[in-house]
């Protein structure tokens, strides 16, 4: 199933927050991304309906297997692309911004070629 860039960003954010927080809530996601809680709630509803997240009765958000798979793929792309750009002399700020855009549009074939080229 195709998933849009916004959904990928939410899933990646949930993954990152789950590594540092005991539980992830919509307010944590809103704070991390600088969005209104109401916007995050709508996105969480869509992710839940597409079986990418589970929301407990207490409002705790966790990734399903499919959500985690997507989040980890996007996170891997982000890390590899940003590090690759910085290794070529791109400033950290620019590399992180560019990686955030590129991670969503690069084909798997091109991403694998970059990984092979840089020896990862």
Short names for language-model regions:
Residues 2-35:
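N-terminal helix-turn-helix DNA-binding core of bacterial DNA-binding proteins
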Residues 59-77:
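Basic, amphipathic "hinge/linker" alpha-helix immediately C-terminal to the N-terminal HTH DNA-binding motif
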Residues 53-54:
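Short hydrophobic beta-strand motif reused across regulatory alpha/beta modules
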Residues 10, 29, 40-50:
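Basic amphipathic alpha-helical segments that dock to polyanions
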Residues 38, 93:
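Key DNA-contact positions within bacterial/archaeal DNA-binding proteins
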Residues 34-35, 58, 90:
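The short coil/loop that forms the "turn" connecting the two helices of the helix-turn-helix
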Residues 97-120:
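C-terminal regulatory/oligomerization modules of transcriptional regulators
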Residues 6-9, 25, 66, 77, ...:
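N-terminal positioning helix adjacent to the helix-turn-helix/winged-helix DNA-binding module
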